[in-house]
Amino acid sequence: LMGRTGCGKTTLLEIICGLRQPRRGRVIVADRDVTHELPGERGIGYVPQDGAMFPTFTVREQLGFALRLRRRPSDEINTRVSELAGELGVAHLLDRLPQHLSGGERQRVALGRALAAKPKVLLLDEPLSALDEELRDDLAALLKRVQREHGITALHITHSRAESATLADVVFRLDGGRVVETPD
C-alpha cells in the first residue's frame, strides 16, 4: 500500500487490526466481519512503523507477549519463542533489552512478536524504511520467506517503488481516502 505522507495509510492499518474504530463501514478480513472484534481476536499480526518495543521486556518477553496475553501455557510459549528466535535469527539476543539491539534486530523482534500467535494476516508499517540497504535486502528476503512458509497474507506500507516491486504481488495506492489498485 502506497500513498502520500499523511494520507492515512497508518490509520487504515490501525483500523484493520482493531487499534482504531472506523467512523463508518466495516472491516472484513478473510471473508469475516471483524469490525467489532477485539484486536487479539482478529487473527492479525501488526508491525508498527517504530517497532513499538516494550522498553523493560527482553527479546524473549517481547516474542512471548501475545501468547501470554492469550494465557497460553508456559511450555507452549517457550516452544514458540524458540521457534521464532531461530527462524528470525535472534536466538542469541533472547536476554537483551530493546535499547541494546540494532535497527535490523529490532525489526526482526517486532516481526517475531507479530507472528507469535500465528496470524493469517500480517500488517507491516514501513518495516524497512529505517534500515541500510544490506539490512533492507536481508529483511525483505526474510519477509518473503515468512509469508511463503506460513501462508500469510501481508499488507505492507511503503514509500519505495523498489520495495513494492520486490515484495508485492499487488500494489495499491491510498488516494483521497480510497484504496485503488495501481496498473502493472
Residue spans of the language-model regions?
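Conserved ABC ATPase "signature" region
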Residues: D33-T35, D75-L93, K144-R145
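Conserved H-loop
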Residues: G151-I157
